[in-house]
């Protein structure tokens, strides 16, 4: 199977974190660099999905102007419009997601499904920012294009999705506030 393009999702505005989560340091480097490096080991090319007002030193796919204000789904629209094919997406919110988890996700890919996405068995929800999205998912996405807010989670629930379980449940812990950030830094420093 051909290698996928890798999309690093870094465009979200983090009100709770009060800083750009892509610039947080984990693993001795900014999180966006860590995720880009990880994706480069498994993907044919790596792109960073972000807002128009953000600037990074790697290949960016900026949210399309007509997608402004629709939330994270802007990254999916922009990636499909720019690339025109399937991709693996990894959000910067998951500092414990590693290369083994990425390899597992890619190995578990089902190209006949609309998507292959990590599933959180504890919450019963998909982790949309950790998945592989086939071109057929774009067709589903387009049917929601004129909604004021587009939920990738909702589209996944109405699609053919391969549930992929993480090798380690901690890999899908999302860091969303300063307290969680400090806690994860402490646990990483103890290793």
Region locations from a protein language model:
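Active-site-proximal helix-loop-helix substrate-binding element of RNase H-like nuclease domains
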Residues: 154
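Nucleotide and nucleotide-moiety/phosphate-recognizing core
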Residues: 1-128, 132-137, 143-149, 157-172, ...
């Amino acid at each position: 199977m051909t290698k996928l393009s890798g999309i690093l999702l870094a465009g979200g505005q983090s009100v709770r974190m009060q800083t750009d989560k892509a610039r947080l340091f984990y693993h001795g480097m900014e999180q966006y660099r860590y995720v880009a490096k990880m994706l480069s080991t498994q993907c044919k090319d790596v792109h960073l999905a972000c807002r128009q007002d953000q600037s990074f030193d790697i290949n960016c796919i900026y949210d399309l102007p007509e997608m402004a204000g629709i939330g994270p789904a802007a990254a999916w629209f922009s990636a499909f419009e720019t690339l025109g094919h399937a991709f693996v997406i990894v959000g910067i919110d998951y500092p414990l997601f590693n290369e083994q988890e990425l390899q597992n996700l890619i190995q578990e890919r089902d190209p006949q499904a609309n998507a292959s996405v990590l599933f959180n068995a504890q919450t019963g929800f998909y982790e949309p920012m950790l998945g592989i999205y086939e071109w057929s998912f774009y067709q589903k996405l387009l049917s929601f294009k004129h909604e004021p807010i587009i939920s990738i989670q909702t589209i996944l629930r109405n699609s053919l999705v391969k549930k992929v379980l993480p090798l380690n449940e901690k890999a899908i812990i999302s860091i969303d506030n300063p307290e969680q950030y400090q806690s994860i830094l402490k646990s990483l420093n103890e290793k």
